[in-house]
């Protein structure tokens, strides 16, 4: 409340009811376009014109007096929001504060801010920014006001009042006549206006005297008023002195008037000279004059360079800057140094009491009262940080002498807090200094807060996580000794800094869950919804990285519910979207991942909050890779590349790791090797064990594929040492699956299956279906091994179905592989969909689609031309009609199957997709090829058993003998006979006649038309 009360003078229009209305200038302003720049020398009536024009126009208005404090644009937006709130009817949401997360997108923030402000003001309205010359040219406010002018809505007017001309940044607006200029030539008094002012003073001056006054002042309002005041006290009009500047002329005449004023008035003016603004109470306290009310009213009424602003709960007065400069210079001449310092100190105390903190700090600084200045900074630092005014806070601390700064730990602490997000490295160093001072002073609470602050600074930078070790130890010690923290909000933040630090740096710690729950419980009691969302988001992130996805889902649901409440900032919303994107990536929900990423980026684009833009894109990239959508992944990578320069090593580590994953999916081993090496180097440099483990696993797999077994084993050994102590089931699942892939691919069956067994047990227990670096073909291969070995078959099948897995070489011979469609044609036709008959019922309607399916199988199931199909199925109709029949039948087949992708048509050729179909003909052909190349007796025996299990009889034995069917039947029968003849001969050559005869008898049971044993000769086999 003090801050709002303190701001009222700054945002209140001066009362100018007693001044001369300048109708000539009103007409100019009325005729001008939406924005006008009012410029002229001091004392020419700029502020008075702006205020009186507002009264004349009768518009809903907002007044803002700029000063040097507005160089920090966060201060500007803070007070502008206070001004808007004072005029709002309560229907609109409060305007946002420029907190650090907006700084990177200041232009977007500014545009959206003013769009909302203009909507709240409801056209027609007017805004006045007075005192633009007070703002340094280097301030970002220059750009802010340019954007505000460009965003000015129809029906809105804006006046900017300054002693100088518009800056170069506004040149385009001037060129397009969107900003007009009222300068000295327009502002100088006309002879008629000067005469009206003289007449109001009732000095009885004639026309010649007025002419003389006008000639001497050249239309300068301040000069005219001063000369009239001097004439009143001296009885004659003085000559204008030949001084080079208007300020010196002002000082000359003001000195004449001051010298002739009574002692009481002189004392009052000198005692109040240091006040930037005052109420009658404040002026009375400083001057000790009981007639303060009358004095100030008289100065205002006579326009003696004192303005009145009708603020609540009481009005405030301001000296014109020229008068204030004069009075302070006169005080320097008339008062002893110590008296001046006392007045400054007393003025500062009054400003502090009134809530004018900026003015109080400036006054304490000017009188070198460093202790009170530092005390005031420490008292109000938390509020300033919350308002986003870290630049102001840092500047104040910097203005303190070094010996004061380095002796006050809380001053250093707040200086660190003011810079944590924007310059985290400098912030960390300040926290370290504050920590040492707190420790020397025995301030245990201070040491905990400094340690927690240093942690957050390190986390904002994400460049060297090893720095966290020191502060983790500090918080551990504080926990053991029971350091009492001042509030639940502080408890939540401290616990939060601890568990996220443990996640990144010491994931082996078993107490991480306790720290998470402590933070969540402490945050729940807080009214600050953004604090609750901050803690909840980091908690969700941590449990996600530890593989507890069910718990992460619960936390995300709670966060989504909170996010719809009032007061939630864009930063909180984008943080939530970042966590949602990450979660969807982890659980391989590609659509949800892309949606959350897109929504987060849209909020960032709309608000200018780009804190998480890189991570949103990185998680979206990982989600696209996990979904196997390489096109979407490439598009996201293209967006990421321009951002890598500012990403930081941790984020770059993630990106390079994902680029290696991308390269593997594209089968570019060399690029994968290069990217994964870079990722591992950064993971080690950053000091994040979790990512070092993932990068070493990825690199080991790539090296194995490259044939570098020695380095592969070395990385696996280091990985084992890292992962062994980490209590993370998902990391264990990932590493064991990756190790199994490597081992099984290189013939280490026993160790590979042992690792696979443990991995699948974990996957089943915790419901895992994905990991970073997922390669569908490689995972499919190890799951084929699992099914062959009987390892967790139900879970393996569910994983295959959920992720649509098929190895590069389809596992046609693997029993239990959960094919979407199984088609038996050897010995009779049977179509199963997920092991249930599909073609039962509606046989007539399905006859033609099934015939098409049988034909495709007869022709090998792949790359069957449309013409070949139409020639076989519709031989008696013309081309167009045949094509229509083909198209219709294909549509009906896909509809019957319930999966359009199962039957593909590309460039006029039909294929059954091997990801969906198991055909006994395909399985037979593969087994036959394996058997023809087999040499070991045990291998031959196993393959024969499989062949006999698959080849159950002639192709489509129960179907009509169409030409295309008979051709396929004979081809397959011949292949069957040839491979069995080879095996028959193999057993004969080994002297195992009985086994050879048993084989022949089985062959006759299956295929009665097989040739007799006597014809199983090498020549026949060869032929």
What are these regions (language model features)?
Residues 1-23, 788-846, 850, 900-911, ...:
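Short boundary/linker motifs that mark transitions into or out of structured domains
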Residues 1-42, 48, 52:
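Walker A/P-loop-proximal flanking segment of P-loop NTPase domains
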Residues 3-5, 24-25, 48-50, 126, ...:
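Alpha-helical sensor/transducer elements of the RecA-like P-loop NTPase core
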Residues 37, 42, 50-54, 143-147, ...:
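C-terminal boundary/linker of central alpha/beta nucleotide-binding cores
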Residues 44, 49-125, 134-136:
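Conserved phosphate-binding/catalytic loops and adjacent sensor/switch elements of nucleotide-binding enzymes
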Residues 154, 312-314, 324-344, 370-371, ...:
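Intrinsically disordered, charged and Pro/Gly-enriched terminal/linker segments
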Residues 301, 361, 381-382, 398-402, ...:
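Amphipathic alpha-helical segments of tetratricopeptide repeats
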Residues 375-382, 410-424, 448-464, 490-508, ...:
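Tandem amphipathic alpha-helical repeat scaffolds
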